[in-house]
């Protein structure tokens, strides 16, 4: 179920304040965050946000196409190594 339009998009306050400070000083630093649930706002464009995937912080460079999506969509939590090759000799 999608979020109600009357509520508006969600972003954590600490993340928004960090980005606002960087925009005021026009600095480009990597911002570390654990907030995968935050929506990407237009103010985030051009910044690199390190999103936690449960193991490490994955750097995500925010572009215009990402606005409206969640930060967690760009930092996968599971590593897929593929299925094993067909082992025909054990199957009869």
UniProtKB/Swiss-Prot annotation:
The keyword rRNA processing does not apply. NCBIfam families: rpsS_bact. Belongs to the universal ribosomal protein uS19 family. Keywords: Ribonucleoprotein, Ribosomal protein, RNA-binding, rRNA-binding. It comes from Bacillus anthracis. The lineage of its organism: Bacteria, Bacillati, Bacillota, Bacilli, Bacillales. This is Small ribosomal subunit protein uS19. The keyword rRNA-binding applies. GO terms for biological process: ribosomal small subunit assembly; translation. The gene is rpsS. Pfam families: Ribosomal_S19. One of its GO terms (molecular function) is rRNA binding. InterPro entries: Ribosomal_uS19 (IPR002222), Ribosomal_uS19_bac-type (IPR005732), Ribosomal_uS19_CS (IPR020934), Ribosomal_uS19_SF (IPR023575). One of its GO terms (cellular component) is small ribosomal subunit. Protein S19 forms a complex with S13 that binds strongly to the 16S ribosomal RNA.
């Amino acid at each position: 179920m999608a979020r109600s339009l009357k509520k508006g998009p969600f972003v954590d306050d600490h993340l928004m304040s960090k980005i606002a400070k960087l925009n005021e000083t026009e600095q480009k630093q990597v911002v570390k965050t654990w907030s995968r649930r935050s929506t990407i706002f237009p103010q985030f464009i051009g910044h690199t946000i390190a999103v936690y995937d449960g193991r490490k912080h994955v750097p995500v460079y925010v572009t215009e196409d990402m606005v409206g999506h969640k930060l967690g969509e760009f930092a996968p939590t599971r590593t897929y190594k593929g299925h094993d090759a067909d082992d025909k000799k054990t199957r009869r």
